[in-house]
A protein has these predicted regions:
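Juxtamembrane membrane-interface segments at transmembrane alpha-helix termini
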Residues: 59-66, 93, 117-124, 141-150
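Ordered, amphipathic secondary-structure segments that act as subunit-interaction surfaces
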Residues: 75-112
Length: 192
């Protein structure tokens, strides 16, 4: 069986095709999860795999209901609920550190795209899922290096400074102006 034949087979509704869809979701979740695990993120292999498998099963369930029950059923509604639910899961991965750094955005986006990939696999759009998987891996691997280069060559920096009183803030700003350093943005808040 050639690749086109395999893709056509996976698009059918049979036990073998269902198994292939779920195994494809497992592979996709593991591949994305490995990248996050290597970077020691909270959502790693197991989380990404479960999200991808679960969303695949939801889409398979939608297709099953559509194929086997009389009535008008919009199978996209189940997928929409998966995306909504994964949004809540993703929020749990995003934190703001004590130094006002936002962490976990890539993990949240990875969980979201993993759910989308699972939905694509579940409905039988295997070729789209694997093409997207390749692009996701390129994004996580290659673009992180590009992002690092952009940050390293940026002329701006982010500073997090704690002052004991407002007078010191004014002194700091005055000193920056004397040194001809431009402050493009700043935020003040009371310490906890």
């Amino acid at each position: 069986m050639n690749l086109i034949g395999l893709i056509d087979y996976v698009g059918e509704w049979s036990t073998g095709a269902i198994v292939l869809r779920l195994v494809s979701a497992l592979i996709i979740g593991v591949v994305i999860g490995i990248d996050r695990g290597i970077k020691r993120r909270g959502a790693g292999i197991k989380t990404h795999t479960l999200v991808c498998l679960g969303s695949t099963l939801v889409m398979l369930t939608g297709q099953y209901v559509y194929n086997n029950f009389v009535g008008n059923m919009d199978i996209s509604r189940l997928g929409a609920q998966v995306i909504s639910g994964v949004g809540f899961l993703g929020v749990g991965t995003i934190i703001v550190t004590g130094r006002n750094q936002v962490r976990g955005l890539t993990t949240a986006a990875g969980l979201w795209v993993c759910a989308c990939l699972g939905l694509a696999v579940g409905i039988g759009f295997i070729e789209g899922a694997f093409i997207t998987l390749v692009l996701v891996i390129i994004t996580l691997k290659l673009l992180s290096k590009v992002d690092e280069q952009v940050r390293n060559h940026s002329k701006g920096i982010d500073l997090y400074i704690e002052f004991e009183n407002n007078k010191n803030v004014t002194l700091f700003i005055d000193e920056m102006r004397k040194q001809d350093i431009r402050i493009s943005d700043f935020e003040l808040g009371k310490s906890k």
